[in-house]
């Protein structure tokens, strides 16, 4: 619709600079190499090609973003996977908008804060006000490349983040946008695709009677039986999520995200009298949760925290095909996960070392008088090692693998 909030990129310009016969030659981008690509119902990508780019070429581009989303300013990343000779970021904030401004990264940015006067359009009114103009400059910034030993390179990228703290218009009450983690807990618990899933009845209640859980001795045995039963019903589609679709749809399709399956698992465990809760997090390859302020936008998935006794917690996630208690995929073994529980009982947990991972081999052998060594080797796989072995066995073409 015409009155919908939107965001546009304007003033795009780009050039390539090459050294030819001792002279710097500039080649400007033409408009016919700029095009749009739709990537969703409400999102488009603007793509462009810079001409005459080759090894040693210096490229330069600039653009301006006009956005109606005043409450959400994208992070500005000063570094890239190529060296940056010079980069600059400007933002002007009207006095009525209060932002938390966070800078982090190893490289230094030059910053300048100046008073500014500007005209602010509010509906049909034009309001003249003061504000602050922020200028950030980076010079000679090294390339920041992915590394096999680093989960998320963006965690180390020199960048500027702005998050709206509140709005204070004259004649109006101050409106706060700052949230505590307790408020985020409440928001999630009220969400129809999150909190409502925690209240749903077990959709596999009748079928689960075939497990005869009442004959099992310990909670661990019951948990594993329920988990295995569910995994035989629904296959993980290799997608991680925070919110879920209808459990009826998930069971009908026989596949779903880890969130889709985890919510069903929680309902089954509760039905068996075993307390279970979602432990929300940011995946390790999606960046760490900010320490400076709570952020629901940074949450992107969860695992299931299970309390078989009042004093213990164990963890499961439906993305693990051949796992066991406390065997999580490494991408979910974060140092900050938040267990979402009602009545203000939420808590932070560290999932980096939730279970023992051990590979132990012992060899019993003897040497005959002819110098021939014979014997046996016994190998014990525990935790992640056991899960990997089961996966390898399950996907092997034949016994020789």
Regions found by a protein language model. Give the residues of each.
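Short, solvent-exposed loop/turn segments at the edges of secondary structure
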Residues: 43, 54, 84, 129-131, ...
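Second-shell loop/turn segments in exported
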Residues: 45-49, 208-216, 248-255, 390-392
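Secretory-pathway-linked proteins and extracytosolic
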Residues: 54, 66-71, 75, 79-227, ...
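Structured core elements
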Residues: 58-60, 90, 135, 277-278, ...
């Amino acid at each position: 619709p015409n009155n919908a909030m939107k965001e546009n990129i304007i003033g795009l310009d780009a050039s390539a600079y090459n050294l030819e016969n001792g002279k710097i030659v500039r080649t400007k981008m033409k408009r016919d190499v700029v095009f749009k690509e739709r990537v969703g119902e409400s999102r488009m990508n603007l793509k462009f090609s810079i001409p005459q780019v080759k090894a040693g070429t210096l490229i330069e581009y600039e653009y301006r973003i006009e956005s109606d989303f005043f409450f959400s300013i994208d992070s500005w990343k000063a570094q890239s996977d190529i060296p940056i000779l010079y980069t600059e970021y400007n933002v002007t904030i009207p006095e009525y908008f209060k932002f938390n401004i966070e800078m982090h990264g190893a490289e230094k940015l030059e910053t300048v804060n100046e008073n500014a006067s500007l005209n602010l359009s509010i509906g049909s009114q034009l309001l003249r006000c003061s504000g602050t103009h922020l200028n950030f400059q980076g010079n000679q910034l090294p390339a920041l490349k992915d590394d096999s030993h680093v989960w998320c390179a963006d965690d180390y990228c020199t960048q500027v983040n702005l998050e709206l703290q509140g709005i204070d218009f004259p004649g109006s009450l101050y409106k706060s946008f700052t949230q505590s983690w307790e408020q985020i807990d409440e928001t999630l618990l009220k969400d129809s695709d999150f909190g409502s899933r925690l209240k749903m009845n077990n959709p596999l209640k009748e079928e689960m009677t075939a497990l005869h859980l009442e004959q099992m001795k310990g909670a661990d045995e019951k948990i594993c039986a329920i988990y295995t039963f569910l995994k035989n019903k629904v296959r993980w589609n290799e997608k991680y999520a925070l919110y879920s679709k209808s459990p009826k749809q998930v069971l009908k399709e026989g596949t779903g995200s880890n969130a889709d399956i985890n919510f069903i698992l929680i309902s089954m465990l509760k039905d068996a009298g075993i307390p279970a809760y979602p432990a929300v997090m940011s995946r390790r390859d999606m960046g760490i949760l900010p320490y400076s302020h709570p952020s629901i936008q940074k949450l992107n998935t969860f695992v299931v925290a299970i309390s078989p006794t009042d004093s213990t917690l164990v963890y499961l996630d439906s993305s693990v095909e051949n796992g066991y208690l406390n065997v999580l995929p490494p991408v979910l073994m974060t140092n900050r996960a938040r267990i979402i529980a009602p009545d203000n009982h939420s808590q932070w947990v560290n999932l980096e070392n939730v279970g023992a991972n051990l590979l132990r081999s012992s060899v019993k052998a003897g040497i005959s008088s002819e110098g021939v060594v014979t014997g046996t080797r016994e190998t014990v796989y525990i935790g992640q090692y056991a899960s990997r072995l089961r996966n390898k066995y399950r996907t092997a073409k034949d016994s020789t693998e």
